[in-house]
UniProtKB/Swiss-Prot annotation:
InterPro entries in the record: bHLH_dom, bHLH_transcription_factors, HLH_DNA-bd_sf, Olig1_bHLH
Compositional bias of kind Low complexity: 43-61
Signal sequence range: none
Location relative to the cell: Nucleus
CDD domains for the chain: bHLH_TS_OLIG1
Transmembrane residue ranges: none
Known tissue expression: Expressed in the brain, in oligodendrocytes. Strongly expressed in oligodendrogliomas, while expression is weak to moderate in astrocytomas. Expression in glioblastomas is highly variable.
Record protein name field: Oligodendrocyte transcription factor 1
Gene: OLIG1
Gene Ontology molecular function: any one: DNA-binding transcription factor activity, RNA polymerase II-specific
Pfam families hit by this protein: HLH
BP term (GO), one: axon development
Length: 271
């Protein structure tokens, strides 16, 4: 019996100890929250013990914000500037422009140099075509206004040089066979064909004399030990028939320039 009465008192203590809520308590709590800075006052259900769990869940889902933070206006967005280093370095914005200008100037120089190189190459090829084309059978057969390509011009020049070399070898052999053991020296100086090799070129076999023996001349100079030009009658031609000369000038008339006559060449031989 005593135990039952004690248990009833223990169960009834929380209900008797709770003070009943008055109407002014809700307004007082709202004014206190306004003074602290929170806009949302606590709900009336938070005062009762039955709605304690619902209030805690609502406070966790919707946190209270200070009044000053909610009423503070947002600051306007600042326009993006040229960069943080633009104030410290006044010429920072001009540096990319100067670098780009330098690159453009370098590109112009490279283009002009390449253009000049191609122009020089075209001029050289045109000069080579002027020398080679008269000896080109393909050009004579083709269209007259058509220009040979660069590779065709170079191949034709190579063949032309090889042909000239073989002709030179044949000339040496002919001079060596026709002159005999006492072969005269045929010296060429200043010819356009052999302009790349300065000095005199020995065509006929024989030792080269001292430098003072080689007289410089603008055109062909011949030093022959043969007698002056003399003709002998062909066999069966009669006394008044045409004669044949055996000197080197008459044998190779194409080596003597047209500006020099036979008398001038013979006068030069006698010196």
């Amino acid at each position: 019996m005593y135990y039952a009465v004690s248990q009833a008192r223990v169960n009834a203590v929380p209900g008797t100890m709770l003070r009943p809520q008055r109407p002014g308590d809700l307004q007082l709590g709202a004014s206190l929250y306004e003074l602290v800075g929170y806009r949302q006052p606590p709900s009336s259900s938070s005062s009762s013990t039955s709605s304690t769990s619902s209030t805690s869940s609502s406070s966790t889902t919707a946190p209270l914000l200070p009044k000053a933070a909610r009423e503070k206006p947002e600051a306007p967005a600042e326009p993006p500037g040229p960069g943080p280093g633009s104030g410290a370095h006044p010429g920072g914005s001009a540096r990319p422009d100067a670098k780009e200008e330098q690159q453009q100037q370098l590109r112009r120089k490279i283009n002009s140099r390449e253009r000049k190189r191609m122009q020089d190459l075209n001029l050289a090829m045109d000069a080579l075509r002027e020398v080679i084309l008269p000896y080109s059978a393909a050009h004579c057969q083709g269209a007259p206004g058509r220009k040979l390509s660069k590779i065709a011009t170079l191949l034709l020049a190579r063949n032309y040089i090889l042909l000239l070399g073989s002709s030179l070898q044949e000339l040496r052999r002919a001079l060596g066979e026709g002159a005999g053991p006492a072969a005269p020296r045929l010296l060429l100086a200043g010819l356009p064909l052999l302009a790349a090799a300065p000095g005199s070129v020995l065509l006929a076999p024989g030792a080269v004399g001292p430098p003072d023996a080689l007289r410089p001349a603008k055109y062909l100079s011949l030093a022959l030990d043969e007698p002056p030009c003399g003709q002998f009658a062909l066999p069966g031609g009669g006394a008044g028939g045409p004669g044949l000369c055996t000197c080197a000038v008459c044998k190779f008339p194409h080596l003597v320039p047209a500006s020099l006559g036979l008398a001038a060449v013979q006068a030069q031989f006698s010196k």
